Amino acid sequence: RLIDAATKLKKENAKFKIYIIGEGPEKKNLESQIEKNNMSDVIYLLGFKKNPYVYMNFADVFICSSRAEGFSTVASEAVVLGKPCIVTDCSGMRELFGEEGQYGFITENSTEGIYDGMDKFIKNNKMLTEYAERAKEGAKRFDVNIALKTIERNLLDDF
């Protein structure tokens, strides 16, 4: 679905690059889809990386196009890094990004939804800044000191 959305954007002359990190059973499928759609100048399969943070840190935006997720560790890592995030509406994402998408851009769980999210970010640079700030705000929920203060405050409120 990500490749289909990217193919549509490329046909519209949008300028972007996608770097996919990781290994998995879909690799051959992805390679053939990239080749079939003539996307090898736009989409790069980087394979397993011992330290993916180097790549994530230089990314303008993080995209999770999953059909289904449990708790998405990689999406939470993107939030902690303050990356603007485009994620599909699947289990776990609203818990991570807020019910109303306060900390990330939650799209419809479809090719069109992924396309729509990417298109909006490509056409509106201000969204990158806005959602980077939202991600940084969301990352505070993972700060141990803030979590301890919240727990302490909640415990004291009971007395």
Predicted regions and their residues:
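Conserved acidic donor-binding segment of nucleotide-sugar-dependent glycosyltransferases
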Residues: 99-111, 120-125
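C-terminal alpha-helical cap of glycosyltransferases
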Residues: 144-159
